[in-house]
Amino acid sequence: EEDKIEKIIDAGRFTQTSTNMQDVSYTIVKDSIPELRRMTLGTLNAMADKMLGSEETPKHLLKYAHMWKRMYESFVENPDGPDQLFFKAPLLIIVKAQNEIDGGLASAKMELMIDALGLGTYFSGFFERAASMNPKIGEMIGLKEGEKIISCMVVGYPRVEYKRTVPRKPARVTRM
């Protein structure tokens, strides 16, 4: 379904950028998902060890350390088992940019296109966190000097259909 991938990339490509820099780039990951998953889970596990070994780790972050340990242990026991990181999705789109706002705007437009194409996505903050701590992940995805990973979009066909959105707090609006 390369035509759908091209439409998603075009949604990002045609998004406005600061001073028309057009500094956003994309890495499409399909065949390398297992290797990227291994590297990411290994990095998260190492991060969890540091967090659990430090008395300075804020208590609200300890739940993530324990979660990352369980994810890694589950992966080591059965690499082909349940995937709690990328959820067996067939496609990752990693958005990179020099300017975070440019990359964020492109990611938002791409998410809308993904939805319009009948696909589902979520943004993997765990991947972004691991990539920020492991330069080998950046090398693997072709991160250039001056670029930052803005988002990792996990894309596939949704297994469930939601009848409503999640509850949200009211918008905080100032009118002048």
Residues covered by each model-derived region:
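Acidic, surface-exposed loops and disordered segments
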Residues: 1-176
